[in-house]
């Protein structure tokens, strides 16, 4: 008999009371006591982490300066530069303009006769690089032995390919460029197997690509600039020069730029090539400059690995640099000099800049739509397209209300990525090495708004590859982006933080055992689940007090929740509520012992939270927090009265009460006000807290949490006789709608609220509220969305939740 008036002649001991604790706590105290992490005892780990931080800071200083970009050589591009004849009229054209590049080719042939990336895993890359080097050496009639060995490599490799299925992933525009170079080799009578079925297939594919490639697309600034050397017959040179970048290059490609110079003699092209060789010496990379892409990739990696707090200055400098070249009309390319924008770089830039509260507009993505409304990076460049679409999909998750183009792009990219997963050729050895399929599956399965930051950091540590290579016309590496030091620091940092959190968990468990809360056997006892709820997003050591107080308040809240929902009678609850409103413990004298104990614990935790808040904030906050708790308890009492009367309110009435009864406001305020070093003025509190203003951060958090809870728990609650839920109340207002339609309506509200919450969180020029405070609120909400993703995992600790807990707090990363 729950929340009802006590019948005459029946004592409280005679009542048959329900409980809300169907499952015991799955985390044993003995397990926690057994945790003895070496990372908390051995100071050498912390010393090594500090050393790595300093070394990486120095590395980033070099990367973000105007020095040499750490990018691997491209034999393919170097060979194109080597083909440029001397511009010195006195010597004719019988010698190269850049003889050092010819020497580099002669010295860098691999043991198997190829050129390209050593230990290559894509056959298309050495094929393209080798034919390029062979043609360059043959042009200058040098390196006969190298030419012979190169031709033998080409012959043996091509003869092994019986059909298209034998060919792995293709470097960018391979089917455009390689047949063109084969045609040149044939005109020079180089002994290659030109009649092989695979060669004929490539020729056919090239013709199909070119048939769909109009001259307008070539000269329109969108497509094929990176493969000019493969479409010589279609180029209109005067129109093409309009697409030249400020640094003289064409899409930062030394090969394409060398090709244009050979045909036009353009001095800006020559100046670009001179500048690249001045940087790198005897070789050129496949792309230069890549200063915007490199900075964005570094920031993205550091943040996804969970070590960004160590590099805040460097991250801000990198993003300030990128933003100087950002255009909401055209986006950005790989480098600051690019005349043509790139979808991957633009999408990555949009996401990171928005996350750091720069003003960026989604209008930028209109440029990447074709006449059919599809979003493109380059037609036929499938590997590149997948990466671009994944970055665009992630960018779309940061949509604000009314940004329809992001909704459109998200739908398009989700469909594209699902289809990509079904195509086996998408995930050949190239993309398997990138772990691209895992990234796509995770992105499609896990919404950014419902994800666990600490789990994501650990999993990214597990897939991050220091030897990661990117794919263009060559396989290339950006050494500042992926390297051993960054990964070592990320793993060390994760384990060191985990060891700190394990000690905190022991303190939480000890507090809980001594608090008296375990005596309330009718209530859910989830101290470690609540600790996980805050810690999975706010894990920094300095916020230990925030985590502890959040957990304590959550434990007390849950006892109150279960007492009002299931265990207490209405008469008891009225007296308890009155005692809360008057803050008078003497009013509990006529209540059962369990309620007296409950009130004392409640009273003590409220004032502990207030006193800790006052110490941190330096002003009186007891009355503020008391009022918040009063509102919270009154909302519980309202629901108890509904239950007793079997009353189902209308949707608006339910939501008005439900955003308070969900408990997020009291919970988050308690942790928020004790965050180390984060002072919240009255003005800042009013910007966060919904009793003062509507549609602010706290109200949005409470609304989306309430609805998420309802969508997962309403069936179980209805079975227990609790009739009021968002779904039932909406159906009361709309008798004609089905349960499924009501659920869809609720999901629609949640989607809109998530966008409003994102906008409030990432609001530009909102300096009154410390961003660390906003982040704590937002990250806790993300974890809450995971809790209610497939059922109420706080009430029923499911296996997946247990796995998340172990990932974050129990199992270290192997070094």
Swiss-Prot record:
Record motif DDXXD motif, residues: 561-565
Pathway: Terpene metabolism; oleoresin biosynthesis
Induction notes from the record: Up-regulated by methyl jasmonate.
Residues that, per the record, bind Mg(2+) 3: 709, 717
Reaction equation(s) it catalyzes: (2E,6E)-farnesyl diphosphate = (E)-gamma-bisabolene + diphosphate
Keywords for this protein: Cytoplasm, Lyase, Magnesium, Manganese, Metal-binding
Cofactor: Mg(2+); Mn(2+)
Record text about domains: The Asp-Asp-Xaa-Xaa-Asp/Glu (DDXXD/E) motif is important for the catalytic activity, presumably through binding to Mg(2+).
Disulfide bonds: none
Localization annotation: Cytoplasm
Residues annotated for Mg(2+) 1 binding in this entry: 561, 565
Gene name of the encoded protein: TPS3
Function: Involved in defensive oleoresin formation in conifers in response to insect attack or other injury. Involved in sesquiterpene (C15) olefins biosynthesis. Produces mainly (E)-gamma-bisabolene when used with farnesyl diphosphate as substrate. No activity with geranyl diphosphate or geranylgeranyl diphosphate.
Predominant localisation class: cytoplasm
Entry's Gene Ontology cellular component terms: cytoplasm
Cofactor comment text: Binds 3 Mg(2+) or Mn(2+) ions per subunit.
Gene source species: Pseudotsuga menziesii
Protein name: (E)-gamma-bisabolene synthase
Enzyme Commission number(s) of this protein: 4.2.3.59
GO MF, one annotated term: magnesium ion binding
């Amino acid at each position: 008999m729950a929340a009802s008036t006590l019948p005459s002649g029946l004592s409280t001991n005679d009542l048959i009371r329900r409980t809300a604790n169907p499952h015991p706590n799955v985390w044993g105290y003995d397990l926690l006591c057994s945790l003895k992490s070496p990372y908390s005892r051995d100071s050498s780990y912390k010393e090594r982490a500090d050393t790595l931080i300093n070394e990486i800071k120095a590395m980033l200083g070099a990367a973000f300066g105007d020095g040499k970009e750490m990018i691997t050589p491209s034999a393919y591009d170097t060979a194109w530069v080597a083909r440029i004849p001397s511009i010195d009229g006195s010597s004719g054209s019988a010698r190269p303009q850049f003889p050092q590049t010819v020497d580099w080719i002669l010295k860098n042939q691999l043991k198997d006769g190829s050129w390209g990336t050593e230990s290559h895993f894509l056959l298309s890359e050495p094929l393209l690089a080798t034919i390029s080097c062979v043609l360059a050496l043959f042009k200058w009639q040098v390196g006969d032995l190298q030419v012979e060995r190169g031709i033998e490599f080409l012959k043996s490799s091509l003869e092994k390919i019986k059909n298209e299925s034998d060919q792995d992933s293709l470097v960018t525009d391979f089917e455009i460029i390689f047949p063109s170079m084969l045609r040149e080799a044939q005109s020079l009578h180089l002994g290659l197997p030109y009649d092989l079925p695979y060669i004929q297939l490539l020729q056919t594919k090239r013709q199909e690509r070119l048939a769909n490639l109009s001259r307008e697309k070539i000269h329109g600034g969108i497509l094929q600039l990176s493969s000019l050397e493969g479409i010589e017959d279609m180029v209109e040179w005067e129109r093409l020069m309009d697409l030249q970048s400020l640094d003289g290059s064409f899409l930062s490609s030394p090969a394409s730029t060398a090709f244009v110079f050979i045909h036009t003699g353009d001095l800006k092209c020559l100046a670009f090539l001179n500048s690249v060789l001045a940087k790198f010496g005897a070789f050129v990379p496949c792309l230069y400059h890549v200063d915007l892409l490199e900075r964005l990739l570094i920031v993205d990696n550091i943040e996804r690995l969970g070590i960004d707090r160590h590099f805040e200055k460097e991250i801000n400098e990198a993003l300030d640099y990128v933003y100087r070249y950002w255009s909401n009309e055209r986006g950005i390319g790989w480098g600051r000099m690019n005349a043509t924008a790139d979808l991957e770089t633009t999408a990555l830039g949009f996401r990171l800049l928005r996350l750091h509260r720069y003003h960026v507009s989604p209008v930028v993505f209109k440029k990447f739509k074709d006449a059919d409304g599809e979003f493109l990076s380059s037609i036929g460049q499938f590997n590149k397209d997948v990466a671009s679409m994944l970055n665009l999909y992630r960018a779309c998750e940061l949509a604000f209300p009314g940004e329809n183009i992001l909704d459109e792009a998200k739908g398009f990219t989700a469909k594209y990525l699902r289809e990509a997963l079904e195509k086996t050729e998408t995930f050949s050895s190239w993309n398997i090495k990138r772990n691209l399929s895992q990234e796509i599956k995770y992105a499609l399965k896990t919404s950014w708004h419902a994800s666990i930051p600490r789990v994501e950091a650990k999993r990214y540590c597990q897939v991050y590859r220091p030897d990661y290579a990117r794919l263009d016309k060559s396989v290339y590496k950006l050494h500042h982006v992926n390297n051993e030091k960054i990964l070592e620091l990320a793993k060390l940092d994760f384990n060191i933080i985990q060891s700190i959190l394990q000690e905190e968990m022991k303190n939480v468990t000890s507090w809980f055992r001594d608090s008296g809360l375990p005596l309330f056997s009718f209530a859910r006892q989830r101290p470690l689940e609540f600790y996980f709820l805050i810690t999975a997003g706010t894990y920094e050591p300095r916020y230990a007090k925030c985590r502890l107080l959040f957990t304590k308040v959550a434990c007390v809240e849950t006892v109150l929740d279960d007492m009002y929902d299931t265990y207490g009678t209405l008469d008891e609850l009225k007296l308890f509520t009155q005692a809360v409103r008057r803050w008078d413990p003497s009013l509990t004298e006529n209540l059962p012992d369990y309620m007296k104990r409950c009130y004392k614990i409640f009273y003590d935790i409220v004032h502990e939270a207030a006193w800790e808040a006052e110490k941190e904030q330096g002003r009186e906050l007891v009355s503020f927090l008391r009022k918040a708790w009063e509102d919270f308890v009154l909302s519980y009492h309202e629901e108890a009265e509904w239950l007793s009367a079997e009353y189902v309110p209308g949707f608006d009435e339910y939501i008005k009460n439900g955003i308070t009864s969900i408990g997020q406001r009291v919970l988050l305020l308690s942790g928020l006000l004790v965050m180390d070093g984060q002072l919240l003025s009255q003005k800042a509190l009013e910007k966060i807290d919904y009793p003062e203003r509507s549609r602010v951060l706290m109200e949005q958090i409470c609304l989306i949490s309430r609805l998420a809870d309802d969508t997962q728990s309403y069936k179980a609650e209805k079975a227990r006789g609790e009739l009021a839920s968002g779904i039932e109340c909406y159906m009361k207002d709309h008798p004609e709608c089905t349960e499924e339609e009501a659920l869809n309506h609720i999901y629609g509200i949640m989607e809109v609220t998530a966008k409003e919450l994102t906008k409030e969180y990432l609001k530009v020029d909102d300096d009154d509220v410390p961003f660390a405070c906003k982040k704590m609120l937002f990250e806790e909400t993300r974890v809450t969305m995971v809790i209610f993703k497939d059922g109420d995992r706080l009430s029923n600790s499911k296996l997946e939740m247990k796995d998340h807990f172990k990932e974050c707090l129990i199992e270290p990363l192997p070094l």
